[in-house]
From Swiss-Prot:
Domain of life: Eukaryota
Cysteine disulfide partners in this protein: 12-31, 18-29, 38-45, 42-59
Annotated Gene Ontology cellular component terms: extracellular region
This protein's name: Bowman-Birk type proteinase inhibitor A7
Residues the record marks as site: Reactive bond for trypsin: 20-21
SUPFAM superfamilies named in the record: Bowman-Birk inhibitor, BBI
Originating organism: Hyacinthus orientalis
Keywords from the named record: Disulfide bond, Protease inhibitor, Serine protease inhibitor
Function noted in UniProt: Serine protease inhibitor. Strongly inhibits trypsin (Ki = 7.1 nM) and almost completely inhibits elastase. Also inhibits chymotrypsin (Ki = 19 nM). Does not inhibit bacterial subtilisin.
Amino acid sequence: QTWPPVEDRPHCKRCVACTLMWPPEANRCVCGDLVPKCHKGCSQCEKADTRSGRPLYKCLSFEYYNCAAD
């Protein structure tokens, strides 16, 4: 599965991969972002240490997309 460039999806500025939804505003990062909870479809979610003390999570594997494969 290939993911188009992030430029045309404003919510995916710092992503490794992004969802393919319409409208573009509905898109979310799949890999590489820190989120309060992992996305639906994230099959491997890892807690990330943050300085703020609030727990954040990052997705390591999203459905069929392996974030570490890049």
